Amino acid sequence: MAKAKFERVKPHVNVGTIGHVDHGKTTLTAAITNVLAKVYGGVAKDFASIDNAPEERERGITISTSHVEYDTPTRHYAHVDCPGHADYVKNMITGAAQMDGAILVVAATDGPMPQTREHILLSRQVGVPYIIVFMNKCDMVDDEELLELVEMEVRELLSEYDFPGDDLPLIQGSALKALEGEKEWEDKIVELANALDSYIPEPQRDIDKPFIMPIEDVFSIQGRGTVVTGRVEAGIIRINDEIEIVGIRDTTKSICTGVEMFRKLLDEGRAGENIGALLRGTKREDVERGQVLAKPGSIKPHTTFESEVYVLSKDEGGRHTPFFKGYRPQFYFRTTDVTGDVQLPEGVEMVMPGDNVKMTVTLIAPIAMDEGLRFAIREGGRTVGAGVVANIVA
């Protein structure tokens, strides 16, 4: 069956849900697609199809990142439902990096919880520029003062991480009641959609920069070849463009013979879009998550760099003890972890949780990087620090 061609008319904005486990992120995602389909047209998605994580379905915990799309009169939104469960922070890091804005879901019945803080911190570190708050389960709280108190707490928490807590939109609603079709709660979803439209500016795309796309997944398609998927970070990729595959292994070249998005064919993939790129003559085993596709010559793989790092405090879920020179954690760049050796500055013997520190890192495998690239520092899947590449050494 031939694929329908994707028409690009409205501005395309990437958003997603973040917040504590069981506060209603997936229910809200379902409610948005259902209510907006009703009001503006589009395809409704039910809870079960968004919560598509077979490994963990039994316990009702979402693991994988789900992509849905919906429209308002002026925009097309691609929405990722990020996992809330602490074991899957890895997906949060790849998911949150794909947002022009995030919807922070906080249950009015609970208020901010540990993962609420963790996700706000991660949003700050991975560069999510805007956050809108959806206070969920408000139908279960009768006390007006309690709602005000939770709102105040959430706003203060956001301000603590340098988001404009006092000024950002906060909608009080109930995702479940909206999903069940109750008009007053459906209106709150429309209000949320209006806030997305007005508060998140039309993204300034990095479309004029050289093409680069971090690889998230690799598939082999019978008769067509190898497809790599990811979000285009900058530039444009067109059919028949030559590209380089950079990082982890020796740099190789390939030709892009096809671009698709949401199962529709495109002539090109642009910055900010989640696409699949078909690569000519590249074998499935020659490419892996953690590499990037890039315009030839535009980015080089490096192993050694100076960085500015913030080490999470114990309260933020970080380490409970200091670390010393010779520390060897994992450095999470874009979509993958690479082990690295840490050198501390002259005169610094140890680094305490909660400290800011300059460190020089030597990775065991090269990563495509430029100055300004963000990364997380992790130990056994747990985020213990966040940093930015300040200076490339080698």
Swiss-Prot record:
Annotated region (G4), positions in chain: 136-139
Pfam families cross-referenced by the UniProt entry: GTP_EFTU, GTP_EFTU_D2, GTP_EFTU_D3
Top EC class, one word: hydrolase
Domain tr-type G span(s) in chain numbering: 10-204
Catalysis: reaction(s): GTP + H2O = GDP + phosphate + H(+)
PANTHER family: ELONGATION FACTOR TU, MITOCHONDRIAL, ELONGATION FACTOR TU-RELATED
Its job: GTP hydrolase that promotes the GTP-dependent binding of aminoacyl-tRNA to the A-site of ribosomes during protein biosynthesis.
Region of interest: G5: 174-176
Binding positions for GTP per the UniProt entry: 19-26, 81-85, 136-139
PROSITE patterns: G_TR_1, G_TR_2
GO molecular function, one term: translation elongation factor activity
Family: Belongs to the TRAFAC class translation factor GTPase superfamily. Classic translation factor GTPase family. EF-Tu/EF-1A subfamily.
Protein name per the record: Elongation factor Tu 1
Amino acids binding Mg(2+): 26
Keywords associated with the record: Cytoplasm, Elongation factor, GTP-binding, Hydrolase, Magnesium, Metal-binding, Nucleotide-binding, Protein biosynthesis
